[in-house]
Curated annotation (Swiss-Prot):
The active site is at residue 234. Pfam families: SGL. Its cofactor is Ca(2+). GO terms for molecular function: hydrolase activity; metal ion binding. This is Lactonase drp35.
Length: 325
């Protein structure tokens, strides 16, 4: 029989939240505002990227639709459906093509293909027939080569890694291997530091590179931050001050780090304490501004709120990467 006179734990304060913030509770914190509703359905939105004309492209992973959003009118159109299963990221090449990473069967059939903004003229860049990668995300460097993340593995089975593909798309060089579900990836403004999120072990990697872009500098591979909670860090981007913005999947927020990997701020989705809009996956800046767009969905809340883009102002203007150079 319970003794009512014993000290008793109660749900008060932070413990009342569906996704409590403990270690980062003292950080500068803002709450995002609704920007565009993509769908009334719960879609796994991902892959935010802008073209040279400032139009936003994104996708939903499980149905494979590629969307385009006009920031001026907030009009949403479906451009095409991915020819490959489970697309996970879009990056715009300087020539205007969309490079689309796809996860395939989440085991051995992922890859990257390039296409036009209408989904025409498909070109295999990393073929799912010739590799065992499960490719989640990529980032171009100024030479036109790119780094990509291999999304394979589990917390106790680190099969994933990070690789570099030369500008001619013929040579693939490993950067780091034996990590678990490599996910988001970003490159510093001087291209000397590569950031990688490792989802199922809740880690942030900071990789200092030598001038060749593939050799890790002495003592250059570090883990400056360990995240807490379920599920973990997802896609990321940088601003022009080299701050890193990391979406926290399953937590309804984005954490912001300075160029040394120290947390300096966070962005919350409305309703997160009640378990709403928790699947934050990708932050991205509107070109030439400090306005940050964040995609999320309400699948964990029976899709009540659908699939949304939210917005806030970041610390600095977004960094205009390869497609704008």
């Amino acid at each position: 029989m319970a003794n009512q006179k014993l000290p008793t734990l109660k749900y008060t304060g932070k413990s009342e939240s569906a996704v409590p913030i403990v270690s980062e509770s003292e950080l500068q914190t803002v709450t995002a505002e609704p920007w565009v509703k993509i769908s009334d359905k719960g879609l796994q939105l991902e892959g935010l990227n802008f073209n040279r004309e400032g139009q936003l492209f994104l996708l939903d992973v499980f149905e494979g639709n590629i969307f385009k959003v006009n920031p001026a009118t907030k009009e949403v159109t479906t451009k095409f459906q991915s020819v490959k299963d489970n697309p996970a990221a879009i990056k715009v090449h300087k020539d205007g093509r969309l490079f689309i990473c796809y996860l395939g069967d989440f085991k051995t059939t992922g890859g990257i293909f390039a296409t036009t903004e209408k989904g025409e003229q498909i070109e295999e860049i990393i073929s799912d027939l010739n590799t065992e990668y499960c490719i989640d995300d990529m980032v171009f460097d100024s030479k036109g080569g790119f780094y990509f993340t291999d999304f394979r593995g589990y917390s106790t089975q680190p099969l994933g890694g990070v690789y570099y593909v030369d500008p001619d798309f013929k040579t693939v060089t490993p950067i780091i291997q034996n990590i678990s579900v490599a996910n988001g990836i970003a490159l510093s403004t001087d291209e000397k530091v590569l950031w990688v999120t490792e989802t199922t072990t809740n880690r942030l990697h900071r990789i200092a590179l030598e001038n060749d872009g593939v050799t890790i500098a002495p003592f250059g591979a570090t883990i400056p931050y360990y995240f807490t909670g379920h599920e973990g860090p997802d896609s990321c981007c940088i601003d022009s001050d080299d701050n890193l913005y990391v979406a926290m999947y399953g937590q309804g927020r984005v954490l912001v780090f300075n160029k040394r990997g120290y947390p300096i701020g966070q962005i919350l989705m409305p309703g997160r304490d009640d378990g709403k809009m928790l699947r934050t996956t990708h932050p991205q800046f509107i070109p030439g501004t400090n306005q940050l767009i964040i995609c999320t969905n309400d699948i964990e809340n029976h899709s009540e709120g659908g699939s949304m883009l939210y917005t806030v102002n970041g610390f600095a203007k977004g960094y205009e990467s390869y497609q704008f150079q």
